[in-house]
């Protein structure tokens, strides 16, 4: 990736020379510690961070916010993902580790304290349903989701699936439901006007690709999945149901029997989560699907 040709890189390099390189080293060292690989090539997480930073820089300009601060929040937004050598551990919000790293690195770089405070607050409010809305966090939220959809987003889905050790079938079973659910509501999930203008096309492109992919998967491998849009009851007094789109097998992969599906939502560490259980009525084989539901509005 041609990092030094990015507008956000040139702007941050003028403001704090060497800062972007230090963030890069921190993220890539953490990812190599997780994967056990020592090659110097760009890691997936750094590549994604650069894409989100570039998009955040552009969105911030359109939204008349500080583009440098938005780019910094974006660069750090996934920096806590491999904390402790684990991928996306769910026992502690990774944004807390990201905020800690951001403060440490920005202070060492001599970045102004007011800017550090803005970055740390934005990171702590990002994907925290209980936190107050934050303009920088909103921009990075939108940029992050825009980067996950469209054709580059589809490519990243398969990279992440490989990183998690999934083959084609298990990637569809375990993770494609989240991609389909979020792609379907992408325009409504955007928090800034500038991002809403970009989201509709990315949503359509993503859904079109996955439908074609599932059709080809059936023809080439005999793996038959159906995309089903389902309404999931929510606990408590909330009348509105959650709508999800799942790629579900047409039949049990072990015996060809009928699959029974149980859907519910529950409160997770950072979000309201879908918990889907699949059980074959004939042989009893079980599978489960779990992911955070989109926050809309």
Please identify what each model-predicted range represents.
Residues 247-249, 277:
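Residues immediately within or flanking Cys/His clusters that coordinate Zn2+
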Residues 252-255, 280-283:
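Short cysteine-rich clusters marking metal-coordination/redox-active sites
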Residues 265-277:
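Short linker/helix segments within small regulatory modules
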Residues 1-14, 38-65, 76, 128-238, ...:
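Divalent metal-dependent phosphate-bond-processing catalytic cores, especially two-metal-ion Mg2+/Mn2+ enzymes
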Residues 230-242, 260-268:
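Short Cys/His-rich Zn2+-coordinating modules
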Residues 19-51, 79-90, 190-194:
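Active-site flanking loop/helix segments enriched in acidic
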Residues 52, 67-90, 94, 98, ...:
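His-Asp-centered metal-binding catalytic motifs of divalent-metal-dependent phosphohydrolases/nucleases
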Residues 257-260, 288:
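Short functional micro-motifs and their immediate structural scaffolds
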């Amino acid at each position: 990736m041609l990092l030094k040709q990015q507008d956000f890189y040139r702007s941050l390099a003028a403001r704090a020379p060497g800062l972007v390189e230090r963030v890069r080293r921190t993220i890539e060292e953490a990812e190599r510690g997780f994967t056990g690989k020592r090659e110097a090539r760009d890691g997936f997480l750094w590549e994604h961070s650069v894409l989100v930073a570039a998009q955040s820089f552009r969105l911030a300009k359109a939204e008349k916010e500080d583009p440098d601060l938005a780019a910094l929040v974006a660069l750090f937004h996934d920096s806590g993902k491999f904390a402790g050598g684990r991928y996306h551990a769910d026992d502690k919000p990774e944004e807390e580790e990201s905020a800690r790293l951001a403060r440490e690195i920005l202070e060492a770089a001599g970045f102004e304290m007011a800017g550090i405070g803005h970055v740390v607050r934005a990171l702590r409010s990002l994907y925290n349903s209980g936190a107050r809305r934050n303009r920088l966090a909103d921009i990075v939220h939108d940029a992050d989701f825009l980067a996950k959809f469209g054709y580059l987003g589809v490519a990243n889905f398969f990279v992440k699936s490989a990183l998690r050790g999934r083959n084609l079938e298990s990637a569809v079973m375990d993770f494609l439901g989240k991609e389909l659910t979020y792609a379907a509501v992408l325009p409504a999930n955007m928090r800034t006007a500038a991002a809403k203008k970009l989201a509709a096309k990315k949503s359509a492109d993503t859904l079109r690709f996955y439908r074609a992919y599932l059709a080809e998967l059936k023809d080439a491998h005999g793996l038959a999945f159906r995309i089903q849009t389902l309404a999931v009851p929510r606990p408590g007094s909330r009348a509105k149901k959650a709508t999800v789109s799942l790629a579900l097998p047409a039949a049990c992969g072990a015996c060809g029997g009928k699959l029974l599906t149980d859907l519910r939502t529950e409160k997770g560490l950072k979000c309201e989560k879908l918990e889907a259980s699949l059980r074959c009525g004939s042989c009893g084989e079980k599978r489960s699907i779990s992911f955070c539901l989109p926050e809309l509005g």
